[in-house]
A protein has these predicted regions:
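Extracellular S/T/G-rich loop segment that most often corresponds to the catalytic His/Ser-adjacent loop
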Residues: 1-12, 16, 20
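Substrate-binding/access-modulating region of protease and related hydrolase catalytic domains
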Residues: 2-6, 45, 181
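C-terminal subdomain of the subtilisin-like protease fold in secreted/lumenal serine endopeptidases
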Residues: 16-111, 115
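Outer membrane beta-barrel translocator domains of Type V secretion systems
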Residues: 97, 104-216
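Outer membrane beta-barrel transmembrane domains
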Residues: 152, 168-171, 175-191, 196-202, ...
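Outer-membrane beta-barrel "beta-signal"
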Residues: 243-245, 298, 315-327
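A short, acidic, flexible beta-alpha connecting loop/helix-capping segment that sits on the rim
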Residues: 308-314
Length: 327
């Protein structure tokens, strides 16, 4: 149908759903859906034309995430991983006409993140942050990796003697553009770098070695929906037995015990069209897992070789063979 009465009723329906939409904006929305390509169309007679009210109740243009008040919007894109949102899924977005719509962001967040520590048991290093680097050098008590092209860097001291059979290791690590515990992009925010201070207490007795480590990670980031990231604390432990070239080990992979983020999300739009946000707190978490490994190193004539195998309770298995030919 067409005409003034139908148009006014349609405007009233739009304003019933979105009270803050003005008559002018509502008329523009309806005009965008009106069908006028029919014989004899006369705006003085038919008004806006044949209105598709169902179409008028759908979003116009791209849905975007509103900022505080009516100060602007941001594109709905990106993801966040390593954070447990629980059952939280719906937020408010706005279309190009400024109308609010509930959207589901379930596909844009996940508590799972690729584990950074799978290769931990296939090396002989004591500190765990080493496993974010391809090469780490040890010279005396110094443990380090030169700054790479991305700006990643690690350096620390090892084998600081505390008492008979007890040692302390300390490591400082900078990772560019990432945090080892969670990831975010797009509307959530951007991680510029993370800094981790790791301390490890080691006890050696006969052929056994016990390591207990703690990592304290801070995050430098540009905020988006994420407005705050607290320091992240994680712990790990390992016990190993070595006899000449054979090394057996069991342990726990680094596990987050403390750390969370604040996320400011649009929740409602009031009758004046003002967007209201709520701040939610979500925990950074990973799955607790244990591992076991075996490594054997020996030589035959002028060939040095190493055999290694590793598995963890996350279902990951790995084996490797290294051969070095000495001339």
């Amino acid at each position: 149908d067409a005409g003034g009465t139908t148009a006014q009723a349609s405007i009233a329906l739009i304003q019933q759903v979105w009270p803050y939409v003005t008559d002018e904006v509502a008329a523009q929305i309806l005009a965008g859906t009106a069908f006028t390509d029919f014989a004899g169309f006369d705006p003085d007679v038919h008004g806006l034309g044949v209105i598709d009210i169902d179409q008028a109740l759908l979003p116009i243009g791209e849905l975007r995430m509103p900022l505080d008040g009516r100060e602007g919007t941001r594109a709905i894109n990106g993801e966040i991983a390593g954070v447990n949102f629980g059952s939280f899924d719906n937020v408010t977005a706005v279309d190009s006409a400024g109308r609010g719509f509930d959207i589901n962001i379930n596909s844009m967040h996940t508590p799972d993140i690729q584990n950074n520590w799978y290769d931990v048991a296939l090396t002989d290093s004591i500190t765990r942050m080493d496993y974010n680097f391809d090469y780490v050098y040890s010279e005396g008590m110094l443990n380090y990796s030169p700054t790479d092209e991305s700006g990643n860097f690690t350096m620390g001291l090892r084998d600081i003697k505390l008492a008979k059979g007890w040692y302390l290791q300390g490591q400082y690590t900078t990772l560019a553009d990432r945090n080892p515990w969670f990831h975010m992009s797009g509307m959530w925010g951007t991680i510029n770098s993370s800094e981790t201070i790791e301390t490890v207490v080691t006890h050696v007795k006969d052929k056994f070695m016990f390591n207990m480590g703690n990592m304290h990670t801070t995050t430098n980031f540009d905020s988006g929906l994420v407005t705050n990231v607290t320091p992240i604390d994680s712990v790990w432990g390992e016990i190993s037995w070595r006899n000449e070239g054979l090394r057996l080990a069991v342990g726990s992979m680094p596990y987050v015990v403390k750390g969370d983020i604040d996320v400011r999300l649009p929740s409602t739009i009031d009758s004046q069209g003002i967007v209201h946000h709520d701040t939610f707190n979500f925990e950074i978490e990973n799955q607790f897992a244990t591992y076991s490994s075996v490594n054997y190193a020996n030589s035959f004539r002028n060939i040095n070789y190493t055999l290694g195998a590793y598995n963890n309770t996350l279902g990951f298995y790995q084996a490797q063979v290294k051969l070095n030919l000495a001339f």
